[in-house]
Amino acid sequence: MIGFLQGYVVSLQQTSTHRTLLTLDVNQVGYDLYVPSRIRQHLPPDQEQMRVFTHLQVREDQMVLFGFAVVAERDLFRQLIAVSGIGPQLALALIDTLGLQDLVQAIVNSNTKMLVKTPGVGAKTAERIALELRSKLAEWRDQAGLKTLPSAGPIDSVQEDVEMTLLALGYTSQEVMRALQAVGQNTALAKNSDTEAWIREAIAWLSQ
């Protein structure tokens, strides 16, 4: 088993199949690792080494390394691929789309509407992920030291309208999710079914 690799980042590129590939120079040996694109946020300055936590997948025809900036992401990845029908690329897509904290929160809360925002994840797959992992992740989240956030966001009757409006204004789905999660911490707003109020608060947060 390879727990982690530490070396210099040679390149970070998008492959023809839309995967993110990191090449790491470890003692003059180049390792190619498939990584979440979010790893860009953790890249070190030039001439500094980076530690990447790894998962090794052994196939009949090849060995594939997956890399993560933090060990909790790697551990979550391993739990995701243990779910029937969830392969490594879909697990990476889940982590990339929602991020560590929001993904764990969505699974623990059985928030399938959040999970299906990931390309390739349909309603049945989202339900299966939540069913198989919510109890495990609720316990693991505490052990991993992840923050427990209150459930936040518009009530179901207005959520779709709010999201569609913000997306139409040019915000990405990730920006929209984070904005609604952030402004939803406002107790009064969380109980508000006024679509316009949610949109105003979200835009104000995104404009900071």
From Swiss-Prot:
CDD domains: UBA_RuvA_C (cd14332)
Domain of life of the organism encoding this protein: Bacteria
Domain II, as annotated region: 70-148
Major localisation: cytoplasm
InterPro entries to which the protein is assigned, alphabetical: DNA_helicase_Holl-junc_RuvA_I, Hlx-hairpin-Hlx_DNA-bd_motif, NA-bd_OB-fold, RuvA, RuvA_2-like, RuvA_C, RuvA_C_sf
One of the protein's GO biological processes: DNA recombination
GO MF assignments: ATP binding; four-way junction DNA binding; four-way junction helicase activity
Region (Domain I): 1-69
Region described as Domain III: 159-208
UniProt xrefs under Pfam families: HHH_5 (PF14520), RuvA_C (PF07499), RuvA_N (PF01330)
Listed Gene3D superfamilies: 5' to 3' exonuclease, C-terminal subdomain (1.10.150.20), DNA helicase RuvA subunit, C-terminal domain (1.10.8.10), Nucleic acid-binding proteins (2.40.50.140)
Residue span of region Flexible linker: 149-159
Assigned keywords, A-Z: Cytoplasm, DNA damage, DNA recombination, DNA repair, DNA-binding
GO CC, alphabetical: cytoplasm; Holliday junction helicase complex; Holliday junction resolvase complex
Keyword DNA-binding part of the UniProt annotation: yes
Location(s), subcellular: Cytoplasm
Stated family: Belongs to the RuvA family.
Domain remark text: Has three domains with a flexible linker between the domains II and III and assumes an 'L' shape. Domain III is highly mobile and contacts RuvB.
UniProt function note: The RuvA-RuvB-RuvC complex processes Holliday junction (HJ) DNA during genetic recombination and DNA repair, while the RuvA-RuvB complex plays an important role in the rescue of blocked DNA replication forks via replication fork reversal (RFR). RuvA specifically binds to HJ cruciform DNA, conferring on it an open structure. The RuvB hexamer acts as an ATP-dependent pump, pulling dsDNA into and through the RuvAB complex. HJ branch migration allows RuvC to scan DNA until it finds its consensus sequence, where it cleaves and resolves the cruciform DNA.
Complexes and interactors: Homotetramer. Forms an RuvA(8)-RuvB(12)-Holliday junction (HJ) complex. HJ DNA is sandwiched between 2 RuvA tetramers; dsDNA enters through RuvA and exits via RuvB. An RuvB hexamer assembles on each DNA strand where it exits the tetramer. Each RuvB hexamer is contacted by two RuvA subunits (via domain III) on 2 adjacent RuvB subunits; this complex drives branch migration. In the full resolvosome a probable DNA-RuvA(4)-RuvB(12)-RuvC(2) complex forms which resolves the HJ.
Descriptive protein name: Holliday junction branch migration complex subunit RuvA
Organism: Acaryochloris marina (strain MBIC 11017)
Lineage, highest ranks first: Bacteria, Bacillati, Cyanobacteriota, Cyanophyceae, Acaryochloridales
